[in-house]
Amino acid sequence: MQIQKKHIIGWSFLGIILFISYYLLGGFTEVKIELKEQEKFYITGKKFIGESKDATLDSLVEATHQAYTEGKLSGTFSICFFGNPDEADTVEVLVGTMHTEEITPPKNYVQESFKAGTTIVASIEAEAVVAPSATETNEKIEGFAKENDLRLKDIFIEKYEDDFKIVTVVPVEQNR
């Protein structure tokens, strides 16, 4: 009987620690969605076209993030998907940094410009391990667009503003 009591206390204590950790990492934080006007911006990085599960994409993200952390790329680390990544087997992705000024890209990098306009912005402040998946966030964005009679451009941009803040920006074409 004494061993069972110790197990119950031990498991309860572990459960409390896990609950508190989940809370502190932002596990109960909701995605905030709003309509915002976005000024013209640029993304400088490297492009990938292929399967989303291709290891080459993972390597590209890691290498580009390293260049960003080493100061070779300025701005906000971002991943731009041309088309909804949840709806296609083949993806076109630009991995790099977002900035408001046009720059001369480093060797082997490209720069895309994005016009000013209305965007749907979804933000979450949570550690990536407990944050909603990109698929869940994209579904919420699409639901928001439908509720507000908005048509999305097929561009999904994930900005990693802080360790605990991920922002997804999706340009809006026009009202239906």
Question: What is each of the regions a protein language model found here?
Answer:
Residues 2-176:
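A solvent-exposed interaction/effector surface
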